[in-house]
Amino acid sequence: MAIANKNIIFVAGLGGIGFDTSREIVKSGPKNLVILDRIENPAAIAELKALNPKVTVTFYPYDVTVPVAETTKLLKTIFDKLKTVDLLINGAGILDDYQIERTIAVNFTGTVNTTTAIMAFWDKRKGGPGGVIANICSVTGFNAIYQVPVYSASKAAALSFTNSLAKLAPITGVTAYSINPGITKTTLVHKFNSWLDVEPRVAELLLEHPTQTTLQCAQNFVKAIEANQNGAIWKLDLGRLEAIEWTKHWDSGI
């Protein structure tokens, strides 16, 4: 998918990886970039607007833990204004295994609910035009950081959901792929809580190993958007972009 002249909604587009990705997207010249985030950041929005004045950048406050009906109402406002949306990026995430319910609500349920809400506008069975979803998951969805099992499980769930969305594309007209960053230098990983304090130094230990910058991750994210491969499981690690081949151990047969 060429980003130029497209309409894009980016949930959590002002976070660490999110904001650098928003910058890279704006440089690529979409028609509209709509950022949905929990906390407004006027300076960040102003920076994005200045980066490419030809791109219309707008912001709406959004908490992914709200009911689907509220999300649908917000999306209707956006669709009424833009008429069409080409790409939805689901990027909300927290890393704090003290907050079990919230971790699941933000990292998994929020992705499911936002996706469910946009189907009302995209699903070809309802006369919709289809669309593309990019879900930010994590390499911990492949193999857990076992000291943060709640976070890792929430990302594995989001990855599984995304893989299913891709297989449903012939029915819905909506394609999907996952973006799975490795350890990236963001505020998310500088300090966080392990489950039941099983490893108080988990963040410190992770950062002793090679990482990548948010800019490296963002640049590869844009490459994945441009590749636009339904069902792709993209690993963005150590500054590299790699498509992962998922090993099938069981098949429902339906």
Swiss-Prot record:
Q: Which GO terms describe its biological process?
A: alcohol metabolic process
Q: Where is NAD(+) annotated to bind?
A: 10-33
Name by which UniProt lists this protein: Alcohol dehydrogenase 2
Origin, by domain of life? Eukaryota
**Active site residues of this protein:** 151
Instruction: Offer a single GO CC term for the protein.
Output: cytoplasm
Query: Which CDD domains did the record assign?
Result: ADH_SDR_c_like (cd05323)
Q: How is the quaternary structure described?
A: Homodimer.
- According to its UniProt record, the EC number is 1.1.1.1
Q: Which Pfam families match?
A: adh_short (PF00106)
Q: What is the lineage of its organism?
A: Eukaryota, Metazoa, Ecdysozoa, Arthropoda, Hexapoda
Reactions catalysed, semicolon-separated, are:
a primary alcohol + NAD(+) = an aldehyde + NADH + H(+); a secondary alcohol + NAD(+) = a ketone + NADH + H(+)
**Record carries keyword Cell inner membrane:** no
Stored PANTHER family? 15-HYDROXYPROSTAGLANDIN DEHYDROGENASE [NAD(+)], ALCOHOL DEHYDROGENASE-RELATED
